Amino acid sequence: LVMSGLRLPALPRAIWFFHGSPHNNIRLDLHTPGCGWKAATVDANRLPAYLLAPTLPLAVPLMNIRPMYRALWPVGQRAIAAREALLDIDMTAWHTYQLDWGVRGAEFRVDGELVLRTDAAPRGRLGFVMWIDNQAMVATPWGRVGWRTVPIEQPQWMEIGALRIESAMR
């Protein structure tokens, strides 16, 4: 691993297959739960997000009111290019995961089946990270933020049969 040294904090930019335990609530998409096995993208380092930032002190408390959340969050969701799809698969079985990410968007596939397509994928360089942990995070549009560790009651593991990373201009 090569780390690039100390840097200022950055706004979230991610494109991933991600599992959040029931203790998590990272709700990026209006219609997708904040936990579970997902395909997702987010890019808060975009001009629309910066333009919307001055409204946060008013918008975040208002989103605690369900009708306001339904009205306001889609604007925020578009601004941070958040897209998610819950994956209805057995995580303990072998699967082939594919992520095609280009300048015009991204497509996520599981076992060859398209599970998420977006035209607003993160721009710029990102690193490949694969991990397993026992952390839980809460980060909601209505202002709930928290972090904790979750006790592990049984062995945890991640198995990879093959990994291929290719770079291509699209």
Language model segments and positions:
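Secretory/extracellular carbohydrate-interaction modules
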Residues: L1-R70
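Short, aromatic/His-centered strand-loop micro-motif at the edge of beta-sheets
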Residues: G36-A49, A71-T96
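Residue-level structural signal for beta-strand termini and adjacent loop
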Residues: A120-A121
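Short tryptophan-centered beta-strand motifs in secreted/extracellular beta-sheet-rich domains
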Residues: A93-W101, A106-F108
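Generic structural motif
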Residues: L6, G20-P22, P33, R104, ...
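Short strand-turn-strand beta-turns centered on an Asx-Gly dipeptide
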Residues: R109-E113
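Ligand-recognition surfaces built from glycine- and aromatic
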Residues: G124-R170
